[in-house]
Curated annotation (Swiss-Prot):
Family annotation (PANTHER family): URIDINE KINASE (PTHR10285)
MF terms in GO: ATP binding; kinase activity
Family per similarity comment: Belongs to the YFH7 family.
Keywords from the UniProt entry: ATP-binding, Kinase, Nucleotide-binding, Transferase
Name of the protein described by the UniProt record: ATP-dependent kinase-like protein notR'
InterPro entries named in the record: P-loop_NTPase
Applied uses, from the record: Notoamides have been shown to exhibit antitumoral activities. Notoamides A-C show moderate cytotoxicity against HeLa and L1210 cells with IC(50) values in the range of 22-52 mg/ml, but the IC(50) value of notoamide D is greater than 100 mg/ml. Moreover, notoamide C induces G2/M-cell cycle arrest at a concentration of 6.3 mg/ml.
Species of the source: Aspergillus versicolor
Domain of life where this protein originates: Eukaryota
Entry's EC annotation: 2.7.1.-
Its biological purpose: ATP-dependent kinase-like protein; part of the gene cluster that mediates the biosynthesis of notoamide, a fungal indole alkaloid that belongs to a family of natural products containing a characteristic bicyclo[2.2.2]diazaoctane core. The first step of notoamide biosynthesis involves coupling of L-proline and L-tryptophan by the bimodular NRPS notE', to produce cyclo-L-tryptophan-L-proline called brevianamide F.
Length: 172
C-alpha cells in the first residue's frame, strides 16, 4: 500500500501543505481511491486475455511513489495486500476491504511500536534524534494508530505483533 502515498508535490499543493507533509502517513495523505481501483481490478474475472495489473511502489530514496512498478500477473492466485488502512471502517478503505477474501490485523503493543518507530525515524533521517522521534510518534504515528484501532472493521484473524517471540517461546 506504500505506493499509494500521495506524492510530495501533491501534499505541497494541499490547502495546509505543512500539515500534510508533516502528517504524511495519515489516512488523508494516501490515494485511497486509487487503492480501491487496484483491488477492484484484482477481483475481475480472469480470462486467457487478462492483462498484467500494475501497482505503484514506494521509493524511499526519492521519498515518493513509483507508478506502475509492481507487476501482478494474471496467473497470480494468492495476493497479499499490506497496509495501515486496509481494515479502516471509512470509505474508500471499507469498500476495498469488502472485496478481499480475508482481512488480518497485526496488533502491536504500543511500547514495541514506539521503540520500532523511534529507530526507524532516526535511522531513515526523518528526524535528527530520539527526542524528535518521540515527538513525531505522539503527534503523527500514534494519532494514526488510534484512529485505525478505534475505527477498525471486523477481521478474520488477529495476529500478535510479537509472534516471533511467541513462536520461539513454544520451541524452547
Amino acid at each position: 500500500m506504500d505506493g499509494y502515498h500521495l506524492p510530495r508535490a501533491q501534499l505541497a499543493a494541499m490547502p495546509d501543505p505543512a500539515t500534510a507533509i508533516y502528517r504524511r502517513g495519515a489516512e488523508f495523505t494516501f490515494d485511497g481511491e486509487g487503492f480501491y481501483r487496484l483491488v477492484q481490478r484484482l477481483r475481475e474475472r480472469l480470462t486467457a486475455a487478462s492483462p498484467t495489473v500494475f501497482a505503484p511502489s514506494f521509493d524511499h530514496a526519492i521519498k515518493d511513489p513509483v507508478p506502475d512498478d509492481v507487476a501482478i500477473s494474471p496467473g497470480s492466485r494468492v495476493i497479499i495486500l499490506e497496509g495501515l488502512y486496509l481494515s479502516l471502517n471509512r470509505e474508500p478503505w471499507s469498500s476495498a476491504a469488502a472485496l478481499m477474501d480475508e482481512s488480518w490485523f497485526v496488533g502491536v503493543d504500543r511500547e514495541i511500536a514506539r521503540a520500532r518507530l523511534v529507530k526507524r525515524h532516526v535511522t531513515s533521517g526523518i528526524v535528527p534524534d530520539t527526542a524528535a522521534a518521540e515527538h513525531r510518534i505522539l503527534s503523527t504515528d500514534f494519532l494514526n494508530a488510534d484512529d485505525i484501532v478505534k475505527n477498525r472493521l471486523p477481521v478474520q484473524e488477529m495476529v500478535p505483533g510479537n509472534w516471533r517471540e511467541l513462536s520461539q517461546d513454544r520451541l524452547d
